[in-house]
Amino acid sequence: MAAAEEDYGVGAEADRELEELLESALDDFDKAKPSPAPPSTTTAPDASGPQKRSPGDTAKDSLFASQEKFFQELFDSELASQATAEFEKAMKELAEEEPHLVEQFQKLSEAAGRVGSDMTSQQEFTSCLKETLSGLAKNATDLQNSGMSEEELTKAMEGLGMDEGDGEGNILPIMQSIMQNLLSKDVLYPSLKEITEKYPEWLQSHRESLPPEQFEKYQEQHSVMCKICEQFEAETPTDSETTQKARFEMVLDLMQQLQDLGHPPKELAGEMPPGLNFDLDALNLSGPPGASGEQCLIM
């Protein structure tokens, strides 16, 4: 019996020593294990060689980076971001279907960098660009139905700084889509509605102090604004594509009439919340081009 207990004690001691030996070996292994290599700062080329970005990808990234300033000149803060997002969405869809057209838009963007660094030169180019966008939107349908030849469309592209346009006509509905987003109810209606609600009281209080001609112009301006609001208020989720198109053309025509009537009273436009910069001359939606505008319009 005593011999058995002695043998058990020796076995237990041997097991404990073996366990300690194993734990020590594991600790030594962990200490000797090399630390992981730092992540490489370069991407290893695959079997086909280094990856190259397509010209369309490069042009698209550059275009998205440069177009935001354009929308900042049309809108303030939140609405500028909204317009930028709409533009990027349209351009991403275009890039998937027609990457070469994105490159053409990039050439237009590069043309902006050639106009000079002074403020006057930049403003002239911005005005030119806005007039061109308006012309594309207003005349998109007419151009598509006119059977314009490839040579004529190429010349039109060149007028936009797209020297190597390949004659694809898909740019026209794309630009019309962008303009539809910029002249949408979400963008225009809140500010216009606020002005139209304040306009009657303002007209009544300034009737005696304004020249008759100016008073009549403000009355007409108020009437046109009300018509634009009525167009937006008539929108329904079930509107057909034909109805939406007709409404857009009507809103664009009314906005052009507003431009012809000049600025609204500062007391009204100045009270608008952050959003639309109601500067119709700056928007330059259409109307008779000036000396510089004659070189910008391609229609």
Curated annotation (Swiss-Prot):
Propeptide residue interval(s): 297-299
Bias category Acidic residues: which stretches? Answer: 16-27
- Which residue positions does Cysteine methyl ester occur at? 296
Cellular component, GO annotation = cytoplasm; cytosol; membrane; nucleoplasm; nucleus; peroxisomal membrane; protein-containing complex
Query: Which UniProt keyword terms apply here?
Result: Acetylation, Cytoplasm, Lipoprotein, Membrane, Methylation, Peroxisome, Peroxisome biogenesis, Phosphoprotein, Prenylation
Residue ranges, annotated region (Disordered): 1-63
Q: Where is this region: Necessary for PEX19 function on peroxisome biogenesis?
A: 2-91
Q: Does the keyword Secreted apply?
A: no
Pfam (any one): Pex19
- On whether Cytoplasm is a keyword of this UniProt record, the answer is yes
Task: Quote the residue positions with lipidation, kind S-farnesyl cysteine.
Answer: 296
Q: Name the domain of life this protein comes from.
A: Eukaryota
Give the N-acetylalanine positions (modified residues).
2
Question: Whom does it interact with, and what assembly results?
Answer: Interacts with a broad range of peroxisomal membrane proteins, including PEX3, PEX10, PEX11A, PEX11B, PEX12, PEX13, PEX14 and PEX16, PXMP2/PMP22, PXMP4/PMP24, SLC25A17/PMP34, ABCD1/ALDP, ABCD2/ALDRP, and ABCD3/PMP70. Also interacts with the tumor suppressor CDKN2A/p19ARF.
What name appears for this protein in its UniProt entry? Peroxisomal biogenesis factor 19
Source species of the chain: Pongo abelii
The organism's lineage is: Eukaryota, Metazoa, Chordata, Craniata, Vertebrata
| Recorded name of the encoding gene | PEX19
